[in-house]
């Protein structure tokens, strides 16, 4: 199993990150919070990972913090929650927000996450409430991302729409969310603001 990767950040195209580790490129899927925290292309980075093995593929999922990776591992234990949906949940809200909603049993708020219907939200609350006891309000990482002015705002917005679609949003909804964000922001900032527009 691969527990972490340490190398040069080669590319960022949500939801995927490409890391060069001694000449080998590892493709890693990650929640948006990790994109905000990881740095810029060319930086030396370290990602905690979880290897997910299926019949048809071996996938790597990456996380900027142990708290996120731990919640991911708990989420994929829930019946009906796959790795992709778990990444979508972690992209839609912070670990603390999720733990808080589960703790108070706020299933309706969880249905605002793409792909999470009423039954799935209720199952998340029921199955995870006991498992998340003691998580409290763990320190969430303070993410600071550099805002880089894009020379091609249209392409940035198109890439942001694609990223939101890959996180489970419908095309029309993703397009509407991105169009509401001001132009000239980095890809990460555009996605972050689009996700913030969905009030959870």
From Swiss-Prot:
Region of interest: Domain II: 65-143
Keyword Signal: no
Gene Ontology biological-process entries: DNA recombination; DNA repair
One of the Pfam families matching this protein, by short name: RuvA_N
Domain III: annotated span: 154-200
GO MF term set: ATP binding; four-way junction DNA binding; four-way junction helicase activity
Family that this chain belongs to: Belongs to the RuvA family.
SUBUNIT field: Homotetramer. Forms an RuvA(8)-RuvB(12)-Holliday junction (HJ) complex. HJ DNA is sandwiched between 2 RuvA tetramers; dsDNA enters through RuvA and exits via RuvB. An RuvB hexamer assembles on each DNA strand where it exits the tetramer. Each RuvB hexamer is contacted by two RuvA subunits (via domain III) on 2 adjacent RuvB subunits; this complex drives branch migration. In the full resolvosome a probable DNA-RuvA(4)-RuvB(12)-RuvC(2) complex forms which resolves the HJ.
Record-given protein name: Holliday junction branch migration complex subunit RuvA
The gene coding this protein: ruvA
């Amino acid at each position: 199993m691969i527990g972490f990767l340490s190398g040069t950040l080669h590319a960022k195209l949500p939801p995927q990150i490409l890391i060069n580790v001694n000449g080998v490129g590892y493709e890693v899927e990650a929640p948006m919070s990790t994109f905000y925290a990881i740095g810029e292309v060319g930086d030396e980075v370290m990602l905690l990972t979880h290897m997910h093995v299926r019949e048809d593929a071996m996938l790597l999922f990456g996380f900027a913090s142990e708290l996120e990776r731990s919640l991911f591992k708990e989420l994929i234990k829930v019946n009906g929650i796959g790795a992709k949906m778990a990444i979508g949940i972690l992209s839609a809200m912070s670990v603390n927000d999720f733990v808080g909603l589960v703790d108070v049993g706020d299933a309706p708020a969880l249905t605002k996450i793409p792909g999470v219907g009423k039954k799935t939200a209720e199952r998340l609350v029921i199955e995870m409430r006991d498992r998340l006891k003691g998580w409290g309000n763990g320190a969430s990482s303070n993410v600071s991302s550099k805002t880089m002015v894009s020379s091609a705002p249209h392409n940035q917005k198109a890439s942001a729409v694609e990223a939101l679609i890959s996180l489970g949003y419908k095309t029309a909804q993703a397009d509407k969310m991105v169009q509401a964000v001001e132009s000239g922001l980095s890809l990460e900032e555009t996605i972050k603001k689009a996700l913030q527009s969905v009030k959870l």
